UniProtKB/Swiss-Prot annotation:
Belongs to the IlvD/Edd family. The gene is ilvD. The active site is at S472 (proton acceptor). It comes from Saccharolobus islandicus (strain M.14.25 / Kamchatka #1). Binds 1 [2Fe-2S] cluster per subunit. This cluster acts as a Lewis acid cofactor. This is Dihydroxy-acid dehydratase.
């Protein structure tokens, strides 16, 4: 049955004449005011290529909604560009922006009594932020990803932004010249759109499809593709059907839908940030999802997609062979997906995949069969142990290391760790510990890409890293993040000392500090938290409200 509309209570009837007067001021006619009023929430910013073009996409989405008999009004949300903030105070605002985006969409939607929602995003936190709002609002909603950039090239090598970060380390280690670094910088990201590898933005775009919240095939076309425009228009049109049939976001965002998304994440070897974001979206949808669900699904799901940074290909390559539905179909045929879940098409996942038009081209070089995987286990593993009682995350798709034991080299900030790598303090065989970079400690749980890229770029191939911060989706190597509890709240990572032995054991799903329980307890008794880095402003407010990484680092009422 049709969804109950919000807009009549705000815009119909004698007493709402002042409200209608304002709608007339922006060009709506009597006929348009009488139609369902829908929001186009657009994460738009000129501060970077990821969301530079989304305002234009919003205009296309409006055309699609009008074709479906709806009256659209667009509004922007904020965007924090992760790459520009990387390695600076700006990165502390990245994860914060996810929850701010969710709050902004909620506020705009409810304040203006919209009936349905189209969300358009690009950079890392925009997709989960908008999906969190959709889950929270529980209204007819559909998402469209803005698309990735085309890859760059230099000296016959295909480039992504990951190569620029690692080139800095290579230059500092005198492995390349300054001119080579400059040429890589100029060529790595040649168009509008998000980072081209399967980093966080493309991972979350893929998750929007796997959750059933986006049209099949819509995540993979590049930002510059004409098919991107087509998908945006069709997304706008599809909202009309959702409203007509009364399909709301929580009808789609079920526990089974999240299992499908986690399965897809594991099969594609996507970003560890997706663990945080899926937990957060599930929280807003009222779905009980835990880190244990990720490991349970990881064990049964093979890693089959050779996507950068763990593999060889970028999103544009996946698009050429059929996009995310190619991965989903292989998983469905292997009995690894719930085919009966509802999606934004009004059809089930199985129906979508049966009706999707797959290109008649080879794809096994990018997406393998489930019976011939790259690795038998999914691309992400959750570790627990004496160093991470509530959990930590490692991306095994981006490393072949299954066990690492080494002496700790401890730093209390990302900046100190970066200087340590630069100055040669970090030696082969060591485990770099970066703490007080968690949700409350940093605050904002920044990504450690500057440090991990410096390690890789310097040729330190036998160094691991453990942090209560996050990693960029571009990170590769034996890097463990999201350690919970974090140092700021007295997690065991707070009492690690230089020279302590750290054990990372993927097969046993363990992350341990090789000390006796008694010694750990004694050190924790002697520990006291440092003063907060921020005592006022947004980051101080965020630190007071945010939960631990093991719970999705969502902000909750105090």
């Amino acid at each position: 049955m049709p969804a109950k509309l919000n807009s009549p209570s705000r815009y119909h009837g004698i007493y709402n004449a002042p409200h209608r007067a304002f709608l007339r001021s922006v060009g709506l006619t009597d006929e348009e005011i009488g139609k369902p009023l829908v929001a186009i929430a657009t994460a738009w910013s000129e501060a970077g290529p990821c969301n530079f073009h989304t305002l234009a996409l919003a205009r296309v989405a409006k055309e699609g909604t009008k074709e479906a008999g709806l009256s659209p009004l667009a509004f922007p949300t904020m965007v924090v560009n992760d790459n520009i903030g990387m390695g600076s105070e700006g990165m502390r605002y990245s994860l914060v922006s996810r929850d701010l985006i969710a709050d902004m969409v909620e506020a705009q939607f409810n304040a203006h009594a919209f009936d349905g929602l189209v969300g358009i995003g690009g950079c890392d936190k925009t997709t989960p932020g908008i999906l969190m709002a959709m889950a929270r609002l529980n209204v007819p909603s559909i998402y469209i990803y803005g698309g990735s950039a085309e890859p760059g090239y230099f000296m016959g090598k295909r480039l992504t932004i990951e190569d620029v970060h690692e080139a800095i380390g290579a230059y500092l280690a005198k492995r390349i010249t300054e001119n080579e670094l400059y040429e890589i910088e100029k060529r790595a990201h040649p168009t509008l759109g998000t980072c081209s590898g399967l980093f966080t933005a493309n991972t979350m775009g893929s998750m929007s499809e796997a959750l059933g919240m986006a049209l099949p095939g819509s995540a993979s076309p590049t930002a510059t593709s004409s098919r991107r425009v087509m998908y945006v228009r069709e997304t706008g049109k599809a909202l009309g059907s959702l409203i007509e049939n009364g399909i709301k976001s929580r009808d789609i965002l079920t526990f089974e839908a999240f299992e499908n998304a986690i399965t897809t994440l594991m099969a594609m070897g996507g970003s560890t940030n997706a663990v945080l974001h899926l937990l957060a979206i599930a929280y807003e949808a009222g779905v009980k999802l835990t880190l244990d669900d990720f490991n349970r699904i990881s064990k049964r799901t093979p890693y089959i997609a050779s996507m950068k940074p763990g593999g060889d290909y970028v999103m544009a390559d996946l698009d050429e062979v059929g996009g995310v539905p190619v991965v989903l179909k292989k998983l469905l045929d292997a009995g690894l997906l719930h085919g009966d879940v509802l999606t934004v098409t009004g059809k089930t996942m199985k129906q979508n995949l049966e009706q999707y038009k797959y290109p008649n081209v080879p794809h096994s070089h990018i997406v393998r069969d489930v019976k011939n995987p790259i690795k038998p286990r999914g691309g992400i593993v959750i570790l627990k142990g004496s160093l991470a009682p509530e959990g930590a995350v490692i991306k095994v798709a981006a490393t072949n290391v299954v066990k690492f034991e080494g002496k700790a080299k401890v730093y209390n900030s990302e900046d100190d760790a970066f200087k340590g790598v630069q100055s040669g303090e970090v030696r082969e065989g060591e485990v770099v510990i970066i703490r007080y970079e968690g949700p409350k400690g940093a605050p904002g749980m920044p990504e450690m890409l500057r440090v991990t890229a410096a390690i890789m770029g310097a040729g330190l191939n036998n160094v691991a890293l453990v942090t209560d911060g996050r990693f960029s989706g571009a990170t590769r190597g034996p890097m463990v993040g999201h350690v919970a509890p974090e140092a700021m709240v007295g997690g065991p990572i707070a009492i690690v000392e230089d020279g302590d032995t750290i054990v990372i054991d993927v097969e046993s799903e363990r992350l341990d500090l090789k000390l006796s329980e008694e010694e750990i307890k004694n050190r924790l008794k002697r520990w006291s938290p440092p003063s907060p880095r921020y005592k006022s402003g947004l980051l101080a407010k965020y630190a007071s409200l945010v939960s631990q990484a093991s719970m999705g680092a969502v902000t909750r009422p105090a």
